[in-house]
Amino acid sequence: MLFSVFYLSLFLSVGLLSARRAVPDGSAAVIVPLGCGFGVSLLAVLPALFAVVLGFTPPAVALAAVAAAGIGASLLYRGTRLRGMAKDPDSGALWACLLPVVLITLYLLHTHVLHLVDGAYHTGQSCYGDMPMHLGFIKYIAQSGEFLPRYPLLGGTHRFGYPFLCETVSSVFVVLGADLRTAYLLPMLPAFLSVYGMFWQLARRVTDSVGKACLAFYLFFMGSGLGFVYFLGSADSFAGIFTGFYTTPTNFVEKNIEWVNPIVDLLIPQRATLFGWCVLLPAVYLLWRFCYEGERRLWPWLAALVLPLPLLHTHSALALVLLCLVGGVYTLAQGPRRKTLLPWLGLAAVCGAAWLCQMLPTVLAQSLDGQHMLRLHFNWINGQDDGTLRDNYFWFYIKNIGLVYLLLIPAFLRAKPKQRWLYGGGLAILALAEFVVFQPNNYDNNKLLYVWHILGCILA
C-alpha cells in the first residue's frame, strides 16, 4: 500500500507542477484542485501508453513512473516551483464551502466501497450494480495484462467499448500489489478534490462572486428539485426516504423523479463520471480563461489535460467538444485574427488526432457495430418508445430540477454576454442529448444533461 501511495504522490506532484506552470497567477486554492486534475490525467495516460506495447504489466507501470518523473524534472528545470503562490483572500471561502461535502463524501466512500462488517462486505443502494462491474474490470486488466482490454464478462469475445481508463487508474495499483479496496479508492480521492474544487473555481471565475460560487456549488451537489413534496404527506412516506428502495426526493421512479443526486448516484458509483468530471471541470475552467478571457497561451495545457478524456468518460469528451465549438464561434464573432485562430487550430489538431486514435478501435467501433448504441430518442427518460411523454416536457424538468430550472430564463436575460455564450454551449449539449441517445440505456444520457445543469447552476 505504501508503494501505491508513493506512486500516486509522484503523479500528483507532477500534476501540481503542471498546474502551477499553466496558471502561474493561481493561488493554492486553484493549483491544488487543478493539479489533481492534471495528476489523474497523467495517471490515465502514461501507463496506458506503455501498456499498448508492453501490456498492462509491471514494466509498463514502472516506465510510466519514470516518464512522470521526467516530466516533473523538466518542469523543475524550467523554474517551476510550488512555493510563492499568489495569495487569495477568498480561499478560505472555498475550503469552508467544500469541507462539509468532502467529509460526507469520505464517509460514503468508507461505507460504500467493500466495507467489511462482521465478515461480510457492505455497500449502498447506488453501488449494487456499478461497483461489481468496476471491480471486475479493474482486477481483470491487472491480472490479464491484456491491453487494449476486452470484456471479461463476455469471455473476451467483444471489444472493450466502455471508457476503460477510469479502471486502469486503479488497475495500476493492483499491479503494484495494493489490495482491491485500496486500489479502488486511491485515485478517487484526488478526483473528488478536483471535481469539487474546480467546480467552485469555475463558478467564481464566471460569476466573479464568492457568494454566487458557493450557491451554485450547493445547488448542484445538494439539489434544488421538488421531489421532496411527495414525501410530506405522512410520517410513513417521509420514513421511506431512509428505508425504501428507490424512494428518495431525487430518485423516485414511481413519480418520474429521476434527477439523482450527483454525489451518491453518479460520482461514487460511476467511476467514468467521476474521472471524466475530474478532467472536464478543470478543462472548462481553462477553456473559460482561454476563450473568454483571451489567454491564448493556455491551449497546450488544455490539450494536454484532456488527452485521455474520451476513454475516461466519452460523454464528458463530447460535452467539451460542444463547449469548444460554441467558444470557437464566439472567437470568430469577435473578429477572426491569425493570433486568435491559430491556438484554436492547435487545440483541434492535437485533440482530434489523439482522440481519434483512442476512439476508432474502441468507443466508435462499438457504437457503429449494430449494438443499438446510437439512435434518435426525444426527452431523455421522460420520453417513451412510442413517442409519447410520461409528463409534460416542462413539468418534468420543473419537478426534477426545481428552482434552478425556473430561474434559467431570467438568469440568462440578466447574464453578461460572455456568460451567455458559455451557457450557449450548455444549450447545445441539452439539444443534442434531448434528441440523440449514445448508449443502449436512455437513462445514461444524463451524463450529458448534468454538464448542461452545471452551467445552469452557475448561470442561475
Model-derived features with residue positions:
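Active-site lumenal/periplasmic loops and adjacent helix-entry segments of GT-C-fold
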Residues: 102-279, 314
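Hydrophobic alpha-helical membrane-interfacial segments at the cytosolic entry of transmembrane helices
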Residues: 94-103, 215-219, 304, 336-362, ...
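Hydrophobic/aromatic-rich transmembrane helices and adjacent perimembrane loops
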Residues: 189-192, 273, 318-321, 441-460
